[in-house]
Amino acid sequence: MGTVIAYDCLKRVPDCPKIDGLLTIGSPLGLEEIQQKMTPEWTRANGFPSDKLSGSWINVYDALDPVAGFDPKISNDYLKTLLPVIEDIHEPNFGMWRHDITKYLAGQKLRTRLRGLLDL
């Protein structure tokens, strides 16, 4: 639920500092049950937290992740003035428990995007 808390802060906490980039990993933010709890601040048409996020939002998921897998792609749920701006990256994990940060961090796609976000 860390990504839900981070998003909630970006949208609802006035004193939340601005950030240059956001990386969500195995996030349940695509689930309608989560989105319903974020209204009225969240809308599909303008869900991107552009007041607090000045750079990229990269969402990494595994389709078999039990937390994110039911709706892992969030670029269509958090638009910026009706346009998709989030980059959804499918990073296949392995093993029985796919919602494991060590498995995500072992993925080449995630590491490549993270280096880009950090300007390394």
Residue ranges and their predicted role:
Residues T3-L120:
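Lipid deacylating catalytic domains
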